[in-house]
Amino acid sequence: MNRTAIEQAAQFLKEKFPTSPQIGLILGSGLGVLADEIEQAIKIPYSDIPNFPVSTVEGHAGQLVYGQLEGATVVVMQGRFHYYEGYSFDKVTFPVRVMKALGVEQLIVTNAAGGVNESFEPGDLMIISDHINNMGGNPLIGPNDSALGVRFPDMSEAYSKRLRQLAKDVANDIGLRVREGVYVANTGPAYETPAEIRMIRVMGGDAVGMSTVPEVIVARHAGMEVLGISCISNMAAGILDQPLTHDEVIETTEKVKADFLRFVKAIVRNMAKN
């Protein structure tokens, strides 16, 4: 939680961006296409930004995109960092700290996730109502910098009730069926076993993945309002009698691309108005 490193990265970006972004977006596996919709786009590879890690996963482009989306000034992570890549939680969540330093107050996080709830189908979009941190760690462990947030942040509303309602209203308006449920984060990179999925279901999980929770914890610590959306890219282990592959994840996110774009763009449009 090095404030100097955060400020260096933010200063570098402030010199590139004409105004402060209002909304930050983090795009998960195969969902980076949203960044292509941004107008007056300024694209900056992660490797150019001081102190930024670099994404190593297929389906993650590895650049920050600033510009206009549906009437809002946004900054978008096209490709995120994962704990399983060998980064510390501090590095995984560093971009969220930088977004806050740039002036972002609202964050939309997206991911590809395995469906644990047996009523879900691949291609469903799920509004995250809450999460379970099953990663065995927390990005806030260590000394707390009170300039960045309080020592013991409240997580009773990790995902903004207001933004969840806004997203449900938007889905209704555009005629899109969306789910709502609890996202469980594991470290990965191995997919879960059928026994682990049964455990997650008993714990109250509806979808499972390997990201999002660290970023959300840090966003809440920083006082940001958060909306989370999972694309159910496959059914989790043991539900269907077939092995899981990353290719399947990318394939499903390709199919659901149009719905995802429509949904997130309409959400941003409504957030810009409110």
From Swiss-Prot:
The keyword Glycosyltransferase applies. Keywords: Glycosyltransferase, Phosphoprotein, Transferase. Pathway: Purine metabolism; purine nucleoside salvage. It is an enzyme of class 2 (transferase). Its EC number is 2.4.2.1. A purine D-ribonucleoside binds at residues 192, 234. Phosphate binds at residues 29, 60, 80-82, 112, 211. Disulfide bonds: none annotated. One of its GO terms (biological process) is nucleoside metabolic process. Gene3D superfamilies: Nucleoside phosphorylase domain (3.40.50.1580). InterPro entries: Nucleoside_phosphorylase_d (IPR000845), Nucleoside_phosphorylase_sf (IPR035994), Pur_Nuc_Pase_Ino/Guo-sp (IPR011270), Purine_phosphorylase (IPR011268), Purine_phosphorylase-2_CS (IPR018099). It holds the Pfam family PNP_UDP_1. NCBIfam families: PNPH, PNPH-PUNA-XAPA, PRK08202.1. Belongs to the PNP/MTAP phosphorylase family. The purine nucleoside phosphorylases catalyze the phosphorolytic breakdown of the N-glycosidic bond in the beta-(deoxy)ribonucleoside molecules, with the formation of the corresponding free purine bases and pentose-1-phosphate. Cleaves guanosine, inosine, 2'-deoxyguanosine and 2'-deoxyinosine. This is Purine nucleoside phosphorylase 1. It comes from Geobacillus stearothermophilus (Bacillus stearothermophilus).
